[in-house]
Regions:
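Long hydrophobic alpha-helices with heptad-repeat/coiled-coil character
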Residues: 1-13, 116-129
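Intrinsically disordered, low-complexity regions enriched in small/polar residues
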Residues: 24, 55-58, 71, 111, ...
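Glycine- and charge-enriched low-complexity intrinsically disordered segments
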Residues: 126-145
Length: 145
């Protein structure tokens, strides 16, 4: 898939996901990131995990069984189709993973905005990129090669 095809696929994906309700196991932030990987890199983890868990702990168990990982950071570090880059080099389509206290959250970089699963609105939505906030947290940025 060339860069133009990736951008078109990403635009279609954002259009599909934006404003969907937030549902753990379907449209939580990790599932959104896995859906991006499915469309841009052909990784099938999204299909294997979709609607298979209702809690984050359940998601970790199912992911360990189906994909061999229980933490998305560990999984992304092992995928040959991803390369880790600095936040300063992030561009459209990159996945930013932020380490929270008990889990990792993912947002999809879209230039001046990010696609994110919001606990506040219970929807998938576009939000402003706050680089200072991201830099203040433990994070990694991944790009599909």
């Amino acid at each position: 898939m060339n860069s133009f095809q990736k951008e078109v696929a990403l635009i279609e994906l954002v259009d599909e996901l934006a404003h969907l309700p937030f549902v753990i196991g379907q449209t939580d932030c990790n599932m959104v990131a896995l859906k991006v990987l499915k469309h841009l890199a052909g990784i099938d983890w999204y299909d294997r995990l979709y609607n298979r868990y209702k809690t984050y702990a359940g998601g970790a168990r199912v992911a360990k069984k189906e994909a061999g990982y229980s933490n998305i950071l560990h999984a992304f570090n092992e995928l040959d189709c991803l390369e880790q880059i600095s936040l300063e080099h992030a561009t459209v389509g990159d996945i930013i993973v932020i380490r929270e206290k008990h889990f990792s959250s993912c947002v999809i970089h879209l230039g001046q905005q990010v696609l994110m699963a919001s606990h506040m609105t219970n929807k998938i939505e576009l939000g402003h990129v706050d680089y200072d906030e991201i830099k203040a947290q433990v994070h990694k940025v991944y790009r599909v090669k």
